[in-house]
Structures are given as C-alpha cells and as structure tokens.
Amino acid sequence: MNFKWDYHQPTPEQDQATKELADKIGMSPILASLLIKRGIRTESAAKRFFRPQLNELIDPFLMNDMDVAVDRLNDAMGRKERIMVYGDYDVDGCTAVALVYKFLQQFYSNIEYYIPDRYDEGYGISRKSLDYAASQEIKLIIVLDCGIKAIDEIAYAKQLGIDFIICDHHVPDDELPCAVAILNPKRVDSTYPFKHLCGCGVGFKFMQAFAKNNGIPFSQLIPLLDFCAVSIAADIVPVTGENRILAFHGLKQLNQNPSVGMKSIIEICGLTGRELTMSDIIFRIGPRINASGRVQNGTETVDLLVEKDFQRALTEATMINQHNEQRKEIDRQMSEEANQIVERLESQEHQPAIVLYNEGWKKGVVGIVASRVTEMYYRPTVVLSCNDGIASGSARSVAGYDIYDAIKSCRDLLENFGGHTYAVGLSLKVENIPEFRRRFQLYVSEHILPEQTEALMEIEAEVDFKDITKKLHNDLKKFAPYGPDNPKPLFCTRNVYDYGTSKVVGRQQEHIKLELVDSRSSNVMNGIAFGQSAAARYIKSKRSFDIVYTIEENIYKRGEVQLQIEDIKPSEE
C-alpha cells in the first residue's frame, strides 16, 4: 500500500504552548508537542493522562436506566429468580459475559451464561435462545454487546415472561426494544459523558453500579479489569477518557495478576514473562479468544475465561489455540480468493467500494477477510457468505469514512444490520446482492471525500537521530496504552543514508535490517523494516531517503533503542 505522509508544521501558538508545557512538566519539547496534539495543555491534565486513576471513573448512575437496571437485578436476586447472562460470540461479547457472570456468581448462584451459535442462531438474540431460557425458567436476561436492535425478539421474550437488561454500545435505531433497562451510551437521549465504551465496558459500569448500590467494595471489581483491557483493544474503540483508565489498569492486572483463563491464554501465546501491550492483545490474545466463535462455539471461550483451575484452563486454551490454527488456514484461503476476485473486477472497472460474495466462504471469518481487503485496496469493503439462502457478512471502512451510514442507506434491502462507524455486520437475501452492490457503491462514490481515499500516515514530529535517546524511549512508554485517538507516535527523519551494513533478512527475504546515518547529526541508528524488502535496492544505492518510524526497544538486545520503520521514500531533490 502506498501511504501519503501527513505532517503539519506546528503553528507559533503550538510552539509556545509546547515550550510552556515542557518547562512545567520537565519533559522534552518533542514529548510535550505530542501532548499538545492530544489536547493536553496543563500540568494537571498531563498528570491524569500519564497516571490514570480508578477514582476518576465516571459515576455509573449517570448512565440512562442504570438505577432501573440495578433495581431489577436486586429484585431478581431477592426473589431467587434464575438469571441468564447472554452475549455476542466475539471478544467483546465473551469477555463481557465472563466479567458479569464471574462478578455476580460471587453473590448469587442461580445464574448461567449463554453464547449463541454463530452458524445455527446468528448474531444477536435468537428465538432458539429465548425458547431455551423459557424452558429453564429464566426470568431475567442480561444481554451484553448486542440487543439494541432486537425489538421483535425482546417483545417475544416479554410474552414468555422474561425481562431484559440491555448492555450494548452499538448505534441504536429510532425505536428501542421494550427492555426493562437499556444501558447504552450511544442512545440519542444519553446523558452519559463518555460515548465510546465497548460492550464489556458497559457491563463493567453495570457491575460498578450494582456494587455501589449494595455496599460491595470497588476493590472486588479490580480482578476483572483484565477483561476490560482485552475487550477495549480487540474491539478497537478509542483509548481516551474512561477507556484509557480501564485499559491502563486492565493491562496492569493482565501483567501482574491475570485471571486463570487469561493466564492460560498468555502461556499458549508464548507471552509469559513479557510485559503485555495492547498490540499483544490485538495480534496474539484477541484472535485466540475469537477463534472458538469463528469456527466452533463461543461458549468454549467463556468456559475458559471463567475457569478457576489452571490445568483445566490450559487444556481448554490448547483446544482454542487449535481452533485458531484452523481459522488461520481458512483465513489464508479466503483472502487469496477475495484478492483474485478484486483483481478481476478492477481489471474491468475501478470500484469505489468493494462488495464480495462467495456462498462457500466461512461465515465466521468474513470479518477478518473484509479487514484485509480494506487494508490492501484502501476502500470501504463488504464481504458476504451464505447460509440457508441468506447472505451475511461484515463491512469495514477506511479512516474517516462512516460505513454505518452507507449500509443504512440500503436498509430496505437488508434483513438486519448493526455496528459502528468503521465496522458493520449485515444480512440480506442473496437475490438482493446485485442491487445492494450497486447502491452501496453509488452511495460511497457520492459521499466519500477525496482525502478519505488515500491511506494516510500521520507523522507527529520530525526529529534528528541525536534526539532519539533511551530516556526519550522510556518517556514515550508513558503514552501507552495506545489505540484509536491515542496512536503510537510516528516520527520522521529526512535525508538518511545506509551506513553500509543494511541487508535483507527473513525466511522469504521480505524484511530489511537497517543501519542508518542521519545526514544532519551524523548519528547512527539501527532499525527493522518489516515487509519492505522492495526498498532494499534504493537503500543500497547510496542515495538519501526519508523514513517514518516508531521508536522501540530491541527485544533481542535489552536496553538498545531501535527504529521500527513503517515507510521509506526517496528524499526530494
């Protein structure tokens, strides 16, 4: 993918604000400038950013319906009613179910959990699950990470004598389900100050409110924060505000005292003994938690997450790891087929957006394939498979473009849809696919902005190699946890040269190990450029080039700072 480098020289006002903040907090101007770009301009705001405190969490009772939800839960416990904790089959849903179930189980035993089967029941609340709940004399269902659009299903549940408390974060329609309580910060009438909680985050706020109402110490919620960190990373929600607090302390819990289930996953991932980051969750832990829901049933994942015996958890984690290996092979095959289809379509006509359909593709993997196609071709993408005459799948978007609105514009062709700005799930009749493709592509072509069609690499600062020190790297660590709205800072250095020892490495000679010299300071830095071996010939030509990179620690040489190079371009003459 070709990236457009996006760098804005700081204004005189920003320079002055940077200097003042750097003096106040005793930090380099480079780091102070990163804070200014994140809207942090005072010493107290910087302190809150670097050291988020759990006592800064928002009062959960500011969320609409929270008092009603807590009262109904207390009432259910008082009446000894059977309670079901129900959730989506992805990471966010499974961690949310595990969190709520584990916490409530400490105080109440007449409770069970339920994850719908992706292939048999589909997304959200199924009639099958409601019939099962009625057969088990369930009187209250707490649904997590789904349910905000389940109007017919919750009306049916009401006929069965089952009440619902919805804990969701997806965008609601104008009409809301007839649940007892709807906890969703994205409600149109929401007064909750932070709008970007994930499903597990909403579940945590519910348990925080329940604990507060019942005089349960907040400290009893802390062991569950590792679930929050995993869900925030995997669901790719903004790591700002309340999410930053939950992610910061959740990572701390994950590193210092993870739950038994999480500890077994960490071991299976080969991460034991390492300081875990949000990237480890996104690329290592999250895919394994997701794997059961993609190729088998998400109930296996919750079984693991609530397990108390480490040896049993390790056995379950090994099985889930096998599911992940199976998922990776399916993913590889489907991605190859998807790329072939796109190349064929592109040879005929440029596509403003991509819609792919293959009835043989596995339903649980289409979301991953949609993400890969979006990344490769940098266009809004929908990938669909088929089950019993109904096509279902996932839509993924590019930075800045709201794919939810694009899908919503075609709602008369759809059976169901729901999601966020950048990710939507949808289903429709197979015969509607051609018209959906036409209208979806037309809507995108009319609404996407030119700058949204280019992959941007947002550079935060231009620096010389002399500025890159171990202290700078250590101070940069304080900006973590990273994620949307708080990305890992990208730096740029211009007019660098190969120091003479750069070489192509890797099993397939796909990476470049670099030793570079900065023409302005004559300082030398080591770096690694993954998947960029095509640039090796230019690098060895003794001409200057510009690089964009993050500053990392060399995991093989502890204490040595190196550059992880994200892009390389010839210097402008």
What are these regions (language model features)?
Residues Y119-E121, A150, H170-E175, D189-T191, ...:
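Short gly/pro/ser/thr-enriched loop/turn and capping motifs at secondary-structure boundaries
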Residues Y114, L144, C167-H169, L183-P185, ...:
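Generic beta-sheet signal
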Residues L99, E175-I216, L221-A233:
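Short alpha-helices
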Residues D75-E81, R312-L356, S409-E573:
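Mid-to-C-terminal polyanion-binding domains and interfaces
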Residues D75, V171-N184, L516-S521:
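Acidic-glycine-rich active-site phosphate/pyrophosphate-binding loop
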Residues A150-I151, D235:
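Intrinsically disordered, low-complexity regulatory tails of plant transcription factors
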Residues K139, V180, D546:
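Conserved acidic residues
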Residues N2, P10-L140, L160-G161, A211-R438, ...:
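Hydrophobic helix-and-loop "lid/oligomerization" segment in the mid-to-C-terminal part
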